[in-house]
């Protein structure tokens, strides 16, 4: 799959403004459009693939994600304050932990997707669904 075109200066400025409004770290950019049941994914490129990755829907922060590899867990690695939210007062509603034995696009090795959601499950499961 070919890489998407680099964002324009105007798009970069818009992303910087959105990231600042959400309280995300400087240099955070949108890395995907709206993913069904999750929302847009935002991150600092240097933090990938582990994360943190931030989920945004309609201008609202809805999750923080980490993707530690299976090897990292096997080595006994720890992550302290890894899911600290940029707006620390957001209350985590629930956490989804999924093992990806084959990986997925963007991270094709066995790993865990750990999403700490700030919205109810019923809400994010309705995000960006394809037309039926």
Residue ranges of model-derived segments:
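Metal-centered catalytic cores of metalloenzymes
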Residues: 1-132
